[in-house]
Regions:
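Formylglycine-dependent sulfatase
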Residues: 2, 8-13, 20-199
Length: 199
């Protein structure tokens, strides 16, 4: 008899905990993930740096969460972002360098573009789900600002095709390396864009 009551009590407790957990999960947290090229672990005040003031990011870290055991997937930008987006180790991810795709010549040496009809990097494999798609599937509105480098214009992997609602930045990261970029890209669901456009 006592065993039955114990199991019944455990079942009620688990049901209550489950209902409480469900209630607390109804409100999704806002997620802002900041990834920067060439930034070291100790370059922000929230990680102990005291020479340069970084109050806004420090405040975000204080109100949110900090990664204290996160490491870059690669020492260069496109593969590092690809490692984060796909959840794959750099050795398993197709994006392994900052190769540029340009027009009909698949790979262009860095900086040799004379005109910019189609530019970008190696596309993420459309068979692999990436972070923005996971977020969309879980009811989030998604935005990305800065370097995409997960495909070239018109490829199978541009922000509009990979779960991003609002994008403003560079499809081709080469443009981000110029003091005066030739163009920026935008995809805005709220503005009625149906594909990535140049602005």
């Amino acid at each position: 008899m006592n065993k039955k009551l114990l199991w019944l009590g455990s079942g009620l407790a688990l049901t209550s905990l489950s209902a409480y957990a469900q209630k607390s999960h109804d409100v999704k947290p806002n997620i802002i993930y900041i990834m920067c090229d060439d930034m070291g672990y100790g370059d922000l005040g929230c990680y102990g740096q005291s020479y340069i003031s970084t109050p806004n990011i420090d405040n975000m870290a204080k109100e949110g969460m900090r990664f204290t055991q996160a490491y870059s997937g690669s020492p260069v930008s496109a593969p590092s972002r690809a490692s984060f987006m796909t959840g794959q180790h750099t050795g398993h991810c197709e994006v392994r360098g900052n190769k540029e795709y340009w027009r009909d010549a698949p790979i262009v040496m860095y900086g040799n573009n004379k005109e910019y009809s189609v530019v970008g990097q190696h596309p993420y494999d459309p068979e692999h789900i990436i972070i923005p798609e996971i977020m969309k599937d879980n009811g989030y509105t998604t935005g990305m600002f800065g370097k995409w480098a997960g495909g070239y214009e018109g490829s199978v992997s541009t922000p509009d095709k990979r779960g991003i609602d609002e994008f403003y930045g560079f499809i081709c990261q080469f443009q981000a390396h110029l003091y005066y970029p030739n163009f920026l890209n935008r995809y805005s669901k709220s503005m009625g864009d149906t594909a990535v456009v140049r602005v």
